[in-house]
C-alpha cells in the first residue's frame, strides 16, 4: 500500500468576505413620505458592530446613499435579516409601518413597497 500524502495549504490566508446589501426606497422617497438621508442617518446610529451601536466598527461596515438607494457593505459577517429588522424599526418610529412593507426582491436587496389594498373587496363589504 502506497503512503498517503496529506495536502497542507501553506499561508492559509482567507479572503475577506465582503457582504453588500441594498435597500431600495424609491417609491416612498418619490412620493415625499420618507427621507432617504434621514433613514441613512438612522442606520448609522443603530447598526451594531461587536455589540456597540454607532461606531460601525471603525470602517468594517459602510453605508452609502445614492438618491433613494442605500447600500450597506460589511467586511464582517452581517445579517440581511438584521437590516430588515432595523428598517421595520425605522418605519414604526416614523409612523410609516401601516403603509409600507419590506420585501426581498433579490438575494442581496430589500425594497420598500406599499401594501396592496383591494378597494373592490372593501366596497363589497360596505354594501352588506
UniProtKB/Swiss-Prot annotation:
Modification Phosphothreonine, positions: 62
InterPro entries per record: Ribosomal_eL22 (IPR002671), Ribosomal_eL22_sf (IPR038526)
Principal place of residence: cytoplasm
Cited Gene3D superfamilies: 3.30.1360.210
Pfam families assigned to the protein according to its UniProt record, in alphabetical order: Ribosomal_L22e (PF01776)
GO molecular function, one term: heparin binding
Residue list for modification N6-succinyllysine: 69
Cellular compartments per GO CC: cytoplasm; cytosolic large ribosomal subunit; cytosolic ribosome; glutamatergic synapse; nucleus; presynapse; ribonucleoprotein complex; ribosome
Location(s), subcellular: Cytoplasm
Entry keywords, A to Z: Cytoplasm, Heparin-binding, Phosphoprotein, Ribonucleoprotein, Ribosomal protein, RNA-binding
Chain positions with Phosphoserine modification: 66
SUBUNIT field: Component of the large ribosomal subunit.
PANTHER family: 60S RIBOSOMAL PROTEIN L22, LARGE RIBOSOMAL SUBUNIT PROTEIN EL22
Protein family (similarity comment): Belongs to the eukaryotic ribosomal protein eL22 family.
Protein name: Large ribosomal subunit protein eL22
Source organism of this protein record: Rattus norvegicus
Amino acid at each position: 500500500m502506497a503512503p498517503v500524502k496529506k495536502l497542507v495549504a501553506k499561508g492559509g490566508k482567507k479572503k475577506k468576505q465582503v457582504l453588500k446589501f441594498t435597500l431600495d426606497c424609491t417609491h416612498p422617497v418619490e412620493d415625499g413620505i420618507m427621507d432617504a438621508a434621514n433613514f441613512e442617518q438612522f442606520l448609522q446610529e443603530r447598526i451594531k458592530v461587536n455589540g456597540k451601536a454607532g461606531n460601525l466598527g471603525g470602517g468594517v461596515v459602510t453605508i452609502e446613499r445614492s438618491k433613494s438607494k442605500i447600500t450597506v457593505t460589511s467586511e464582517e459577517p452581517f445579517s440581511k435579516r438584521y437590516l430588515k429588522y432595523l428598517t421595520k424599526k425605522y418605519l414604526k418610529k416614523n409612523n410609516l409601518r401601516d403603509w409600507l412593507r419590506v420585501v426581498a426582491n433579490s438575494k442581496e436587496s430589500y425594497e420598500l413597497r406599499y401594501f396592496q389594498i383591494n378597494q373592490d373587496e372593501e366596497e363589497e363589504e360596505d354594501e352588506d
